[in-house]
Amino acid sequence: MTPANPTLSNEPQAPHAESDELLPEIFRQTVEHAPIAISITDLKANILYANRAFRTITGYGSEEVLGKNESILSNGTTPRLVYQALWGRLAQKKPWSGVLVNRRKDKTLYLAELTVAPVLNEAGETIYYLGMHRDTSELHELEQRVNNQRLMIEAVVNAAPAAMVVLDRQHRVMLSNPSFCRLARDLVEDGSSESLVALLRENLAAPFETLENQGSAFSGKEISFDLGGRSPRWLSCHGRAIHIENEQAHVFFAPTEERYLLLTINDISELRQKQQDSRLNALKALMAEEELLEGMRETFNAAIHRLQGPVNLISAAMRMLERRLGDKAGNDPVLSAMREASTAGMEALENLSGSIPVRMAESKMPVNLNQLIREVITLCTDQLLAQGIVVDWQPALRLPWVMGGESSQRSMIKHLVDNAIESMSQNQVSRRELFISTRVENHLVRMEITDSGPGIPPDLVLKVFEPFFSTKPPHRVGRGMGLPVVQEIVAKHAGMVHVDTDYREGCRIVVELPFSAST
């Protein structure tokens, strides 16, 4: 509004023929029908003009507001500081914008988003104040509702025990909750969310790729991490795609979607640990039975091994005597006694062989070597504590599956750990440390079991794998079948086992097994 139109009225004026004389009327009608409430006041805030939107929002008619002060709209709850800021800006001949709590004629309240600007004459003096405001009560309510919902959602997400993370197409972390950050500190060395995302992608493999490429959700995908000296972690992972419309202006009429990935990770370690404890109790009974059967097999095989020699000697002597006696062999009492002894010996060998407990055939299945090692360490805890042995276990964080028999591989590890404990239990061994590690090397799963015992002499590193050969004193139990059994099991899994001759501070047994191509 300019001083060119000092007389303000709500009455329409008749248009003139000349276009220059139409402009003030057009301008007045424009202000009158503007969708925003407009009022013009004198320097004391007395209302000189109010347009239709002003009357609609406030509920006052023209005759009720003209000449009245703008304070008739005040509810008295707006802080005085706001008004001081308003008049301070106007005194500087600068516009002011802010929000006031106004009151309508019917006493209802509304939020007025107000802009007040000084109207200056040609001399730069303020002659009027122009006020424009709109009712933003509904918008404010919606904004507050959205903000409150955001705060509630954030509170729920932040308090949730499940770890949550939102990723963009480049796998960058867009949003994560405190549980995810704590999980990152527990699982990855640098404790960063990005490193944990990379680890999850690697372990989830196919489900993550399907989610990323096709948007197909997955649920209840379990992964586990062995952390060496700490308890293992079992995680149940869920993933889904979130489709969000592009926010940029140039796609307003042709909106496009951006795909984000939401991962939710539940820590089920406590549940799995309880299940694992129950399983270990059953496993103890099973392995005790297997050890009993293995002891029986060892005893029978040792007896057969010992008896086979004399029987073979009798048979050889009998054949020599038969050739020497020729035709008189049939009546020779010594030869007859030898035949009876040979027959009795062969029958005894057959009976012993038939009495050996038969090993049950195992079906091949994917086996996690880290899990078997942890089970064996748990089963041997009492022995390790009794001998004062410190265990240092360094498992690979992600180890491929090994196809084969779970029970036989567990038995193989148990034999090696038992041998290490036996070796370090000698009185002259003061430093008692058992080091176990797993890693992937040359497309093989490599397991090293190292003890600080007296070690194996270089000239015996091959002989120790022979059946019934033992470096233990005669009075010690277990006469030389541990490593041969280990070698047999490893060979059945197309692997290799050997003694590391370069290691001089004890004994290091190295087992290498091929892993499944599908992992």
UniProtKB/Swiss-Prot annotation:
Q: What is the lineage of its organism?
A: Bacteria, Pseudomonadati, Pseudomonadota, Gammaproteobacteria, Pseudomonadales
* Keyword field: ATP-binding, FAD, Flavoprotein, Kinase, Nitrogen fixation, Nucleotide-binding, Phosphoprotein, Repeat, Transcription, Transcription regulation, Transferase, Two-component regulatory system
Sum up the protein's function in the record's words.
Answer: Required for the inhibition of NifA activity in response to oxygen and low level of fixed nitrogen.
| Residues annotated with Phosphohistidine modification | H305
Where in the numbering of this chain does the Histidine kinase domain appear?
302-517
Asked if tRNA processing is a keyword of the record, the answer is no
A Pfam family matched by this chain, by name? Answer: HATPase_c
Protein name per its UniProtKB record? Nitrogen fixation regulatory protein
**Cofactor field:** FAD
